[in-house]
Regions:
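Mature catalytic domains of secreted/periplasmic carbohydrate-active enzymes
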Residues: 1-174
Length: 174
């Protein structure tokens, strides 16, 4: 997408070339799996003021872009918000209690998990990273899906010296 809007170039490809040229390992960081719940505020609207009741852009669709600078792009590919909000979603502090996909978190759809999986596998295949960091507990979508385990397996099969990092591990996961 960065080739079509924004910088109009493949940013990760530039980093991969630079790392290879300098003899450095390439690391890629992934944060999108929790976009499902973390972007839920984009579905909301103002409760007061002159924009009271006007929904934020997390509810926009590709059709809403006709005649606008983002025509042809689907905001749902960014926000992934075509789903019910999690329990207590209007409480900004609640999201941390739902980090492990529990405590009333709206579980991600199969399509969302598949999209994350496909994009991550594509990045591994294109850029051959040595390190992958997931901003998650254990692996992506743990414990509700084996998607993260399949991604880690793919990296290790492609690069036996590869390293996978997760944000939060307990003693059972180390």
């Amino acid at each position: 997408l960065s080739q079509n809007i924004g910088p109009k170039k493949d940013i990760l490809e530039g980093w991969a070339r630079a790392a290879k040229k300098a003899g450095l390992p390439l690391g890629i960081s992934f944060h999108a799996d929790h976009a499902w719940t973390w972007f839920e505020p984009s579905q909301r609207y103002d409760l007061k003021g002159d924009k009271k009741g006007v929904y934020y852009d997390g509810n926009l669709t590709k059709e809403d872009g006709k005649g606008k600078w983002w025509e042809g792009l689907d905001p749902q590919m960014l926000y992934q918000q075509n789903h019910p909000m999690s329990q207590g979603s209007w409480d900004n502090g609640r999201i941390h209690a739902q980090w492990g996909w529990d405590n009333g978190a709206c579980p991600p759809s199969k399509e969302f998990v598949t999209n994350f999986f496909d994009r991550t596998i594509d990045a591994i295949n294109r850029y051959n990273p040595d390190l992958i960091y997931f901003d998650v507990t254990v692996l992506p979508f743990y414990p509700i899906s084996d998607c993260g385990l399949k991604i880690a397996t793919h990296l290790y099969n492609k690069n036996p010296r590869g390293v996978v990092f997760g944000k939060i591990l307990n003693d059972d996961h180390k």
